[in-house]
């Protein structure tokens, strides 16, 4: 027969094979990245980033991610961490690490990690890794309790009302 071979399925299967081969390396980098962020204060992380130190140079270990050095995307992730860390407190545990093939062109996989922190027991990290093993995107997604959401809402209301009164007075 004159069948057409699907390049899309071949590409996905190739990504699956790559992930199977490098799964332990991806998991190791993910665990060490979260541990590094927790163990260091904002000044140290900022200093490392501004000196272009990748995680490998900081930890003295070899990683498959960001082998050619720190990227702007990793620095963006560090900035997100620095702005979120105060809401989380200290790291208590790292739970499930799930590595899934990313179907987007140029993206190898998406790594999701469940972590528990002192002030927030449900935090999800998401890392999108490119085909060349560079970090494309890193996100920190805390799940807030109803009480935490209400506290933020009250603070926003107070700030909003205060701003209106100040504008009206002057």
Model-identified regions with their sequence ranges:
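Hydrophobic secretory-pathway targeting helix
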Residues: 1-9
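Generic beta-strand hydrophobic packing signal
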Residues: 8, 97-99, 138-140
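Short, surface-exposed alpha-helical recognition segments that flank or form part
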Residues: 21, 145, 149
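Hydrophobic alpha-helical transmembrane segments
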Residues: 97-121
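Hydrophobic alpha-helical transmembrane segments of small proteolipidic membrane proteins, enriched
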Residues: 149-170
């Amino acid at each position: 027969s004159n069948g057409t071979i699907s390049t899309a399925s071949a590409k996905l299967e190739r990504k699956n094979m790559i992930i199977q081969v490098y799964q332990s390396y991806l998991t190791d980098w993910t665990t060490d990245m979260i541990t590094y962020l927790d163990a260091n204060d904002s000044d140290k992380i900022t200093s490392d980033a501004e000196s272009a130190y990748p995680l490998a140079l900081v930890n003295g270990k070899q990683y498959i991610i960001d082998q050619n050095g720190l990227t702007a995307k990793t620095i963006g992730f560090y900035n997100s961490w620095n702005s979120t860390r105060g809401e989380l407190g200290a790291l208590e545990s790292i739970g499930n690490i799930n590595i899934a093939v990313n179907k987007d062109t140029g993206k190898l996989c998406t790594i999701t990690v469940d972590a528990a922190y002192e002030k927030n027991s449900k935090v999800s990290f998401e890392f999108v890794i490119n085909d060349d093993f560079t970090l494309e995107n890193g996100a920190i997604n805390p799940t807030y309790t109803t009480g935490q959401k209400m506290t933020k809402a009250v603070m926003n209301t107070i700030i909003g009302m205060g701003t209106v009164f100040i504008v009206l007075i002057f």
